[in-house]
Amino acid sequence: PRTHSKTIFFNCGKWEVRKGHDILIDAFKSVLKHDTDVELWMMCSNPFNSPEEENKWQNLYSHPNVKIIPRAETQQEVYNIMAQVDCGVFPSRAEGWNLELLEMMAAGKHVVTTDYSAHTEFCTKENAGLVSISDTEPAFDGKWFFGQGNWAKIGAHEEMDLYMKMMKYILNKKGTVNQAGIETAKKFSWQN
């Protein structure tokens, strides 16, 4: 069990607009205005990015309260990192599954995520802080997606909801186990 009082939020996955990495830092900075004893750990990389693109993401997240963690080599290393954090934050516009989020649940960690896309197959108001999504927009990031479909529109209202869910975690759930998340994760295996 963790013994320090600092709240550590966590995100992992490929650096992408689709995963909400363009807005997560702003929501985190809003949290910092109300509680300076917080950190955001980012275990993100994207092997398909150019060095310039990778630097752009690293620079966006260059902040004394943000820790950029290199990609873990094994599942045990991923778990060891997840065991040190308090809450996963996944403000995704679209997902194929969002395995990292489910792994956080399996570790008993609380999660905050968008109420949109594939992870709604296992995220509920009982096991996740769900950010309301009221609209979609053409999926466009200028690299991978060029408007072929739609994804969640994350505007000022959704960013505020993300920040509020992060603060709600600190005020109401810090130090508790996401038992509903553990029960959800038990329903999934590599066999099904």
Question: Which stretches of residues belong to each language-model region?
Answer:
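A charged, aromatic-enriched C-terminal amphipathic alpha-helix characteristic of glycosyltransferases
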Residues: 155-161, 174-192
